[in-house]
Amino acid sequence: LKINSCKASILTKAINTPYDISGTFYDVGEGIAYIRIEGFDKSVKYRVEQLLREFADFEVDILEMAESKNFWQNVNDLDFLKEIEGDLWRVSVKPTDGSRIIEMLDPNIGFLDWCGGLVWLRVDEGLNVREKMQKVEGHAMCLLGGFDQFHPTSTLEKKLSNSIRNKFDPKMLFNQEILN
């Protein structure tokens, strides 16, 4: 389903229905929510009908199978972010905080996944998302840009992480570049 002219909070409303939503995505710039429903034809048809009733106050489009498959593949491949300039960030927060992150950062482009708990951002080069989101609990990874990829960890977290890593990979054979 494609729900036009809506706020990100609609994802929470959708996921809290009993209609077994399998995926959500929100385009911040366009104000469009996408909801994925999967399963057997009869079940999908019933759940779509119920969701259309649930969102009767909105303009809702039903994506055909090929269009839907293509859209969700583009989401998976992050095609929405490829042509946009700026640093690429992946921010994990409580679903209710996803919209706050967008408001705080005013990104070049932003998308919410995981019902708002995963925020994909392209921001101006050099903007430190971690500094800007200090009032929001979460974790930010810089995937393309001039910052460390992983969120800084405390001394205790580093100690715990190293202890676990040493138990599972004592010879340090796996992910040497990432984990060092």
What residues fall within each predicted segment?
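C-terminal substrate-binding/cap subdomain adjacent to the FAD-binding core in PCMH-type
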Residues: 1-85
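Conserved glycine-rich FAD pyrophosphate-binding loop
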Residues: 58-180
